[in-house]
A protein has these predicted regions:
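Glycine-rich, hydrophobic membrane-spanning regions of integral membrane proteins that mediate transport
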Residues: 1-114, 128-149
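Hydrophobic alpha-helical membrane-associated segments
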Residues: 113, 117-124
Length: 149
């Protein structure tokens, strides 16, 4: 996954980022799994997946802030993660599941389509969010390095 500060997030043994370079990263995709299973699970379970993903986003943003006390870096991580891990992929998977649900009467097909879409959408969304933030928030509001810096 790309990151708000890609240049400083190189995965060397001394600088492994718990939230970006380890299996903890998968917690950010909990809501996409919830979107995939939405037609089959209770609403409280579906909403719980968003709780897990939002907690992950908040933890990563807090970690980025705590590392060097730079509030802009924490806000950058919060916005980037919210967009790239929760909002945009949640919307995309929701639409995949809804579209598949209209195309079939088999209850598991939309779930499988939603789950199958997750690995396909991650990188394009990450890059799109990086590009959008590099062209707007990072240089003008947050004054943080762009993803290509």
């Amino acid at each position: 996954m790309a990151s708000p500060n890609a240049a400083s997030d190189a995965a060397t043994p001394a600088s492994v980022d718990l939230y970006r370079d380890t299996p903890v990263r998968f917690l950010g995709y909990a809501n996409e799994v919830g979107e995939s299973f939405k037609p089959l699970i209770p609403r409280v379970a579906y909403l719980g997946t968003y709780g897990v993903a939002c907690a992950y986003v908040a933890a990563d943003a807090n970690d980025k802030y705590q590392r060097d006390g730079d509030a802009a870096r924490g806000v950058d991580a919060l916005i980037w993660q919210a967009l790239a891990s929760v909002i945009v992929p949640g919307f995309v998977v929701n639409r995949v599941v809804a579209t598949a649900g209209r195309a079939t009467t088999r209850p598991m097909v939309p779930t499988f389509c939603g789950l199958a879409s997750i690995p396909l959408i991650i990188k394009p969304i990450d890059h799109a969010v990086d590009a959008a933030m590099d062209a707007s928030l990072r240089p003008y509001v947050l004054k943080t390095p762009t993803a290509s810096d």
